[in-house]
Amino acid sequence: DKVFSLLKKIIKDEKIENLNIPISIVTTDIDNNKEVVIKEGSMYDAIRASCSIPGLVKPYNLNGINYVDGGVLNPLPINKLCYKEKIITVNLNGHPTTSLFGKKTKRRSYLNYFNSLKSYFSNNQNTKHLGIYDITYRSVHMIQNQLSMMQIEKHNTFKNINIPCDVCHPLEFYKAKQILEEGAKFYK
């Protein structure tokens, strides 16, 4: 709630339909299992509804409906864009820079991932114990990255920026400046 109180101070709560640039904010209606695109109404409500990460941030109730992060159903909503001239995608679920076991890695492949799992389960005492959070977090990012890659392949994009999912973790809002700097590196 502290972060969202700060968000209210930073973002002027304008009506989306009155903005100079047309935008669509994607969220997920968790009550009715459907994707919702918000194109009008309160900017704050739309942003708040779209960033409720399941298990970490409670759903946002708006007009009696509970909303969670739009990425649950559509992590890279290219298909919902208002303006489709030159599409620059920013995929926040890119391949991690480290393996689940802390080793630096280049672009991850499923073969590398399964080899890591094989190594882990082969009684190697040097590997760290994977907790349920680690496994769940990485699994969700793998799913979202695959869905994002499918969207990129399907649409004509101008530039694709793939940010490794381990640049930051959910709720590391205090790292905003560092995260923006990291993102700028991937844009070049």
Can you say where each PLM-predicted feature lies in the sequence?
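Short beta-strand scaffold segments in enzyme catalytic cores
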Residues: I23-D29, K58
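A short acidic-Thr-Gly-centered motif at the start of a beta-strand
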Residues: N18, G55-G64
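Short, conserved, surface-exposed binding loops centered on an aromatic residue
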Residues: E17, P59, I78-C82
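A short alpha-helix-loop-beta-strand transition element characteristic
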Residues: I11-P22
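Non-catalytic peripheral regions of patatin-like phospholipases
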Residues: D1-I10, T28-S42, I65, G71-K188
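Short helix- or helix-capping micro-motifs
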Residues: S50
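Short beta-strand-initiation
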Residues: N20-I23, G55, L73-L76
